Amino acid sequence: MNSHSTDKRKKITRIGIGGPVGSGKTAIIEVITPILIKRGIKPLIITNDIVTTEDAKQVKRTLKGILDEEKILGVETGACPHTAVREDPSMNIAAVEEMEERFPDSNLIMIESGGDNLTLTFSPALADFYIYVIDVAEGEKIPRKNGPGLVQADILVINKIDLAPYVGASLDVMESDTKVVRGERPYILTNCKTGQGIEELVDMIMRDFLFTHVQPQGEHA
């Protein structure tokens, strides 16, 4: 678990969502947000890009009518986004504090950022917990490569499982390798297109990050 910050101004649970470019981080946010809202969570979203706010624009388009676009903020880091969430998170901390002040009734902030392959982690000054997203298209061997992000994340998401047959990847092997490198740390397999694993991912967020009672599968309102 990422160490909690001692910043007394922090009011809202902060979750980092990181992973390699193209792994599906933005898609994960887009599919879990409506479910979180349905379950009574009031989320805010911050995305990180080097010289654009394209991810934020994409999320705003996808979540139009679901989440007020003012609750989605893009940060232009001017450098590798992983630096802005790990070595020097001051820009993101400022963005978080701005959002907390503007929307004090919110109870969750998701901070999305890409990183250098498997090395991305989030500063404990920025995120209380973080999720790391990899995808099957990167290859069956990805879990065996370890990397701080993959190994230390509070939840590992293995995304795009529908692509396994097309890239010759065995999900059984990926799961087995994941258990070896992560030990007892949780992981989940997901498919954003079909929704496979998404409700379960939200259950994990609710239970382990927000410390909220989770109803058994099939009983969600």
Curated annotation (Swiss-Prot):
GO biological process: urea catabolic process
Pfam families for the chain: cobW
Binding site for GTP: G19, P20, V21, G22, S23, G24, K25, T26
Domain of life per record: Bacteria
Keyword terms, alphabetized: Chaperone, Cytoplasm, GTP-binding, Nickel insertion, Nucleotide-binding, Virulence
Leader peptide range in chain numbering: none
Keyword Lipid metabolism: no
Compartments in which it is found: Cytoplasm
One GO location term (cellular component): cytoplasm
KW Nucleotide-binding (keyword) present: yes
Molecular-function annotations in GO: GTP binding; GTPase activity; nickel cation binding
InterPro entries: CobW/HypB/UreG_nucleotide-bd, P-loop_NTPase, UreG
Family: Belongs to the SIMIBI class G3E GTPase family. UreG subfamily.
Family annotation (HAMAP family): UreG (MF_01389)
SUBUNIT field: Homodimer. UreD, UreF and UreG form a complex that acts as a GTP-hydrolysis-dependent molecular chaperone, activating the urease apoprotein by helping to assemble the nickel containing metallocenter of UreC. The UreE protein probably delivers the nickel.
NCBIfam families the record matches: ureG
Summary of the function given for this chain in its UniProt record: Facilitates the functional incorporation of the urease nickel metallocenter. This process requires GTP hydrolysis, probably effectuated by UreG. Expression of the urease operon increases the likelihood of bacterial survival by contributing to acid resistance in vitro and in vivo in BALB/c mice. Y.enterocolitica enters the body via an oral path and must survive the acidic stomach before being able to colonize the intestinal mucosa.
Protein name: Urease accessory protein UreG
Organism name: Yersinia enterocolitica
Primary gene name: ureG
